[in-house]
């Protein structure tokens, strides 16, 4: 049984990125698709799609296409899970984290859905800090 599917997703992306893989396959969930949407919008991944699992009626996989520079430079330098099942981390609108002085993003789960730290600051809402990406 997996206790932290978000950490599993981030680890798979980090490992595939370190090994210069073009794609990474992850079991699908709505929150993972939302995280992939944020990563695509912020320019960390090239794209993602949802594929059905062959032989299963309802199971789906999230296929993330990683992004590299012209000389195979990684677009993701690092990923860190912040709030874990054993230790939740929350931030108020006044105390939102800044990743690398604003060069990275913090993914935050709010009442308005998953947002980046900049979107939270603009809307003046806080929430659970899921991960840092830089």
From Swiss-Prot:
The keyword rRNA-binding applies. It comes from the Bacteria. GO terms for cellular component: ribonucleoprotein complex; ribosome. SUPFAM superfamilies: Ribosomal protein S8. GO terms for biological process: translation. Keywords: Ribonucleoprotein, Ribosomal protein, RNA-binding, rRNA-binding. This is Small ribosomal subunit protein uS8. The lineage of its organism: Bacteria, Bacillati, Actinomycetota, Actinomycetes, Acidothermales. It comes from Acidothermus cellulolyticus (strain ATCC 43068 / DSM 8971 / 11B). PANTHER family: 40S RIBOSOMAL PROTEIN S15A. NCBIfam families: PRK00136.1. Part of the 30S ribosomal subunit. Contacts proteins S5 and S12. GO terms for molecular function: rRNA binding; structural constituent of ribosome. One of the primary rRNA binding proteins, it binds directly to 16S rRNA central domain where it helps coordinate assembly of the platform of the 30S subunit. Belongs to the universal ribosomal protein uS8 family. InterPro entries: Ribosomal_uS8 (IPR000630), Ribosomal_uS8_sf (IPR035987).
């Amino acid at each position: 049984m997996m206790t932290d599917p978000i950490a599993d997703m981030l680890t798979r992306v980090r490992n595939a990125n370190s090994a210069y893989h073009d794609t990474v396959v992850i079991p699908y969930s709505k929150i993972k698709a939302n995280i992939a949407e944020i990563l695509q919008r912020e320019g960390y991944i090239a794209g993602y799609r949802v594929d059905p699992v062959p032989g299963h009626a309802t199971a789906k996989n999230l296929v993330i296409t990683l992004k590299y520079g012209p000389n195979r430079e990684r677009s993701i330098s690092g990923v860190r899970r912040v709030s874990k099942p054993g230790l939740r981390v929350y931030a108020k609108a006044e105390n939102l984290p800044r990743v690398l002085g604003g060069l990275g993003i913090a993914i935050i789960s709010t009442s308005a859905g998953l947002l980046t730290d900049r979107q939270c600051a603009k809307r003046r809402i806080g929430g659970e800090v899921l991960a840092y990406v830089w």
